[in-house]
């Protein structure tokens, strides 16, 4: 059985998350290393899955609190700012990615479950996310 570790994303892991992020474009938006690192540092919840010293999955989320709202307005985050006008007490899943070699192993499910646990522990009522339907449609 494979031994995966789950941890918060530190500066060492941020570069590895960036590599994985760029491998997952266009399913997630492209970001510069500096931009992704800045997002991770300002996020309210983040987590990486590490296997054999490689990041094979990660999630970055933002809660609608005062500091995050200020940050999201500063970077002009279109989706978060739109959701903020419609819902309150939410956690926005900004990006989630799993390495293509490790899909169908329930790792994405684990990231979502851990995100949900964070939301419940912090009395957050809603989970929100942008869903990209194109260029791919998931096939069961």
Annotate each PLM feature.
Residues 1-17:
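A short beta-loop-alpha structural element at the N-terminal edge
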Residues 2, 53-58, 91:
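Glycine-rich phosphate/pyrophosphate-binding loop shared by adenosine-nucleotide-utilizing enzymes
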Residues 16-20, 35, 54, 110, ...:
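Alpha-helical elements of Rossmann-like donor-binding domains used by nucleotide-donor carbohydrate transfer enzymes
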Residues 26-52, 58-66:
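Active-site rim helix/loop that mediates acceptor-substrate recognition in acyltransferases
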Residues 60-95:
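Conserved acyl-donor/pantetheine-binding loop and adjacent beta-alpha core of acyl/acetyltransferases
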Residues 98, 104-117:
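Conserved acetyl-CoA-binding loop-helix of GNAT-fold acetyltransferases
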Residues 119-134:
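Conserved GNAT acetyl-CoA-binding A-motif
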Residues 134-140:
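Short, flexible/disordered intra-domain loops and linkers
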């Amino acid at each position: 059985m494979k031994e995966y570790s789950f941890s918060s994303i530190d500066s060492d892991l941020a570069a590895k998350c960036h590599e994985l992020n760029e491998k997952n474009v266009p399913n997630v938006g492209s970001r510069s290393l500096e931009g992704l690192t800045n997002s991770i540092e300002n996020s309210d919840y983040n987590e990486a899955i590490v296997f054999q010293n490689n990041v094979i999955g990660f999630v970055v989320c933002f809660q609608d609190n005062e500091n995050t709202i200020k940050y999201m307005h500063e970077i002009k985050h279109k989706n978060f700012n739109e959701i903020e006008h419609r819902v309150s007490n939410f956690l926005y899943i900004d990006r989630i990615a799993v390495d293509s070699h490790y899909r169908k192993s329930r790792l994405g499910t684990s990231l979502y479950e851990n995100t949900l646990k964070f939301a419940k522990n912090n009395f957050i009522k809603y989970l929100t996310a942008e869903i990209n339907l194109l260029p791919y449609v998931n096939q069961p």
